[in-house]
């Protein structure tokens, strides 16, 4: 069972290419020091997988934390390249828990996953650059639901109308 008060979730763009890996690592270490023990990844390419890999690396180094892979539907990785699929499967194999929300793809599968992430955490670490899509949805939902938010994106010119 996930204790949301000690749980962090991640959201970020699929275009993430490691730009904030060190800041991400530092954020995870700091959050563990603050008492967060469980980290949720939605397992999408880009920031989600990078965040999951950081959690796993820290766990290998002896940091006491858990990774929960939250998969929107069985077979999510089928459309990935061979290299991306291998990376995804390594993370799933090393995760402390795997939660699959649906047996097959359906319209809204990613939104259901994003809602799950927000409703099971109290802290959200994002790589959000202000563009529309699932990351924006999750970021704004986290804001609306009162999660503590940390945005690692260097893009600082977020449209303030998003927060009104």
What are these regions (language model features)?
Residues 1-164:
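Acidic/glycine-enriched connector segments
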